[in-house]
Regions:
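Conserved class I S-adenosyl-L-methionine
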Residues: 1-34
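Class I SAM-dependent methyltransferase SAM/SAH-binding core
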Residues: 48-92
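A short glycine-rich, Lys/Arg-flanked "PGG" loop and its adjoining helix->strand segment in the class I
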Residues: 119-131
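SAM-dependent methyltransferase
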Residues: 132, 136-199
Length: 232
């Protein structure tokens, strides 16, 4: 059972304010063509706009509940034919196809707890790519300001939806809790410094094309967010 299953119906209203990455991932999908593989597809926050732009999406997620919401949203939008949704793990995606683009949006790789798991996931993504194909993902590491503002406090993130962040700077973990009425879940995220992601990509056989500091493609120059583009 995924930690997202209890909050599958809560996820969209919880993340409703997260829109800054959608056009970026849709543009990259259009540049690569159908199909694209999206790892951690969730409820289709990015996959459905991608499908609406005319791109077929093979979406993998470890939460059956999130995939059910994604399928429902796809049907409601008349896009079910463009969505191929599969239950599976980031480290062992159930995909035999070879594609030009694999994405892992919205920090999904931070669910991986060790370098061993990260390398397994990166190698799996590389295995889905045709020669020259690209992996695009985004991750973050917190600023001290982030930690100071949020640590150990319940904060109303959206109307009726509370979120709590418990940061452990020594272990580089974020224990994130979300709740609405009787729906609640807690998950752990493990962050890394950008230099470490760069080294892991190289170890997994990728060549890094770009590391951006935001979805406007500004080159990374320090800060919390990194957006990585690497090719096989």
């Amino acid at each position: 059972v995924s930690s997202y299953d209890p909050i599958a119906r809560l996820y969209d209203p919880w993340s409703t304010g997260v829109i800054e990455d959608i056009s970026f991932y849709v543009e990259e999908a259009l540049a690569s063509g159908s199909p694209v593989v999206e790892l951690g597809v969730g409820t289709g926050r990015i996959a459905i706009p991608t499908a609406a732009a005319g791109i077929d999406v093979i979406g993998v997620d470890s939460s059956a509940g999130m995939l059910a919401v994604c399928a429902e949203r796809g049907r409601d939008a008349g896009l079910a034919a463009r969505l191929d949704l599969r239950l599976g793990d980031l480290r062992r995606p159930p995909v035999d196809e070879r594609v030009e683009l694999v994405t892992c949006p919205f920090r999904a790789y931070l669910h991986l707890a060790s370098d061993e798991e990260r390398l397994e996931a990166l190698a799996a993504a590389r295995g889905l790519l045709r020669p020259g194909g690209r992996l695009i993902f985004d991750v973050f590491r917190p600023s001290q300001e982030d930690v100071d503002e949020t640590n150990g406090r319940w904060i109303e993130r959206e109307p009726g939806i509370d979120e709590r962040a418990d940061w452990d700077l020594d272990r580089q973990t974020l224990t994130l809790s979300v709740r609405r009425a009787d729906e609640q879940s807690t998950m752990t995220l493990w962050w890394l410094e950008p230099e470490r992601w760069n080294a892991l990509l190289a170890e997994a056989g990728f060549e890094v094309d770009a590391c951006y500091g935001w979805f406007d493609r500004t080159p990374y120059a320090g800060g919390e967010d990194t957006v990585w583009i690497a090719h096989r």
